[in-house]
Amino acid sequence: MKTKYSKDFEKSVRKLSGKTLNSVRNTILEVRNASCLDEIPDCKKLVGYDNVYRIRIGSLRAFFIFHIQIIDDCVFFKYLVPRGEAYDKKYEEKLRKDDK
């Protein structure tokens, strides 16, 4: 699958180091090598959203939007946030807006 990244996601990744950064890199490689969403480990569709999914990466959560297109399947990584912040209203509202 193709992958794209938001500025927020890229900014969060730049702040990482060590094992966490390697885990994020490995997850992105797994997504690129996957032919469907079922092949991505720890990937779950969020309840109440049409196209929003999350991947658990240790104590972090990567949220992405997946629109199935006839020509290309593309995973757009939107946010990478700590688990405690992942389900706050702030991100919930942002994801709802982006889900449309």
Name each model feature, range by range.
Residues 1-27:
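Arg/Lys-rich, positively charged N-terminal/basic patches that mediate binding to nucleic acids
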Residues 15, 46, 55-56, 67:
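Short histidine-centered beta-strand/loop micro-motifs
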